[in-house]
Every structure is written in structure tokens, then in C-alpha cells.
């Protein structure tokens, strides 16, 4: 339906408004720069550990920084998207239905290894935003 389509469109517009693409590029450049500096330092002092460092740094920086940052951006886009839907006159309650429909047939999964919040957390957080909008309107 139109309201659920607005959920997707407003979510993607929110990514653009929040400049998530630019943030991702910056984060990636920082990650690579720090990794390069670390790799050079290890190569200069203990070259036998350079490969191990590179693998550990790559895994650690992705799990510890990049994935959580991506989940935060997704949650932020969800929240901004709900406000955009509300301002445009769409039924924001359809957003939770949309994300529930999207999660059908998928396992619950673990946020830790994902770029997106779990469906359960996502719908809970979206409902919180919807409730906040309802309270602000009163």
C-alpha cells in the first residue's frame, strides 16, 4: 500500500538527509588509514606478526566499529523516516507492519554480526518513535 511504500522511500530519503553515505566513506577511510599505520608499525618492529595484525585489525574494526555504526545509521534513518512520513500525512503505523512483513521467514538473528538492527529491535524502536509522535501531537 502507499503508506508502506512511503516507509521505504522515507527511510532511504532519511539516509540521504543524514548524509550516511558520506559518513560511511569517511569511516572507511579512517579504518583503512589506521590499519595502514598499524600494519607499517608492526612490519617495522615485528614483521612476523604483520599478517596476524592485519587480520585481527580487519575483523576487530569491522565488528567493533563499522557494523555497530551501520546499525546506528539504520536506526537513525528509521526514526527520521517516520517523522518524514508523519509530516507528509502518511499512516506511520504502517511502518511497523512493513518491517514485520519484511522479516517474515527470516530467523531472528543477532544484531552483532549485522549491518541492520534485528527485525524485533527495529519494530520496537519504530513503535517508540510512533508513540513519541502521538504524544507530541497531544
Report each predicted region and the residues it spans.
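A Zn2+-metalloprotease active-site environment signal
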Residues: 1-138
Amino acid at each position: 500500500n502507499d503508506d508502506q511504500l512511503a516507509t521505504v522511500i522515507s527511510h532511504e530519503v532519511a539516509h540521504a538527509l543524514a548524509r550516511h553515505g558520506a559518513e560511511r566513506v569517511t569511516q572507511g577511510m579512517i579504518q583503512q588509514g589506521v590499519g595502514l599505520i598499524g600494519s607499517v608499525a608492526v612490519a617495522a618492529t615485528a614483521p612476523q606478526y604483520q599478517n596476524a595484525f592485519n587480520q585481527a585489525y580487519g575483523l576487530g574494526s569491522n565488528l567493533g566499529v563499522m557494523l555497530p555504526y551501520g546499525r546506528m545509521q539504520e536506526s537513525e534513518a528509521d526514526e527520521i523516516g517516520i517523522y518524514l512520513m508523519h509530516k507528509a500525512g502518511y499512516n506511520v503505523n504502517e511502518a511497523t507492519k512493513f518491517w514485520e512483513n519484511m522479516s517474515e521467514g527470516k530467523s531472528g538473528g543477532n544484531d552483532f554480526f549485522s549491518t541492520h538492527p534485528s527485525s524485533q529491535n527495529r519494530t520496537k524502536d519504530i513503535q517508540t518513535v510512533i508513540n513519541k509522535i502521538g504524544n507530541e501531537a497531544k
